Amino acid sequence: MKKHAKVYYSENLVEQVNEFETSFEIKPLERGLGNTLGNALRRTVLSSIPSCAVFGVKIEGIKHEFTVLDDVIEDVVTILNNLKRVRFFYNPSVFSQNSIHVASFLGQKAGQIYARDIESHSGLKIVNPDLYIADVSKVGALKFELFITNGKGFVDFETNKKYVNEVISLLESQIEGSVLAVDSDFSPVLNANYQAVEINSASPIIEEKLNFSIKTDGSIFAKDALSQGAKILIAHLNLLADVENLNKFSADFFGDQEIKEEPIRRFSNSIDALDLSVRSLNALRRAQYYKISDIEKLSQDDFENIKNLGRKSVQEIMEKLQNYKNENKGEN
């Protein structure tokens, strides 16, 4: 029986531009597998990698997108189009399922406003700080909040409008106005290309090398995008390989336990892991507490001194924190 050759997988450092744009080599592969793997990986990383994006915007005093803003050169539609392009570095440990985060600009300056002037309440890092937002002639003339969540693919304005209506009661805000839905492009991969090259055409046994290049928008590292794409394919193929369980429903079809949930517990201690109410989470974040290790040393008096934390919220946090400690005894 023919033995399979050892397959080597490496990053092509010669073609690496930075952590967000690089190339990988996989070799040797049996003839035909280069195109098979390359095509499957390319389609997956372009369509199925999760990230975060703005889904709603609140501008002070604005009820709809056709309202006129005084002392601002751009109209509301233009500002919305600029704001939906603000990108944040995606850290799965910060985003629990369906969690919502807020970033804001509260009119602290006049002149040209850029993405770097936006403050994230959750410590999210903006990856395109030079993105132009608007030109303001008066301090305080423009105030806005961005509402951010995680997802994948492209979500249109109409779908996000329904989502805004569903979660409007959960959105805490410091300004007056309506939450305006925008399109969300969650896909972090800008380009992905592959090439299958024969590497021993003179030999009776022809093998291939797969060159796979990938470029992201800066919200996720290129190697992480490729890794997640491979894991998504593996999760699907594992289901197809399980011929002993045909016609049975698989609750873990996308491999969520491996791809999403395990890293949150094993490699991170974000306060999102406590499953707190939105009010409690926002109060902790505004007080600059983002990790469980930051709050586990606090006393009840310390919690009660945190702004916007009432007795019920303090009790909730302490109970959830104790439950988390009990569940994770022996882990680390």
Swiss-Prot record:
The keyword Zinc-finger does not apply. It is an enzyme of class 2 (transferase). Residues 259-332 are annotated as: Alpha C-terminal domain (alpha-CTD). The keyword Membrane does not apply. GO terms for biological process: DNA-templated transcription. InterPro entries: DNA-dir_RNA_pol_insert, DNA-dir_RNA_pol_RpoA/D/Rpb3, DNA-dir_RpoA, RBP11-like, RNAP_asu_C, RNApol_insert_sf. Keywords: DNA-directed RNA polymerase, Nucleotidyltransferase, Transcription, Transferase. GO terms for cellular component: cytoplasm; DNA-directed RNA polymerase complex. The N-terminal domain is essential for RNAP assembly and basal transcription, whereas the C-terminal domain is involved in interaction with transcriptional regulators and with upstream promoter elements. Belongs to the RNA polymerase alpha chain family. This is DNA-directed RNA polymerase subunit alpha. It comes from Mesomycoplasma hyopneumoniae (strain J / ATCC 25934 / NCTC 10110). The lineage of its organism: Bacteria, Bacillati, Mycoplasmatota, Mycoplasmoidales, Metamycoplasmataceae. The gene is rpoA.
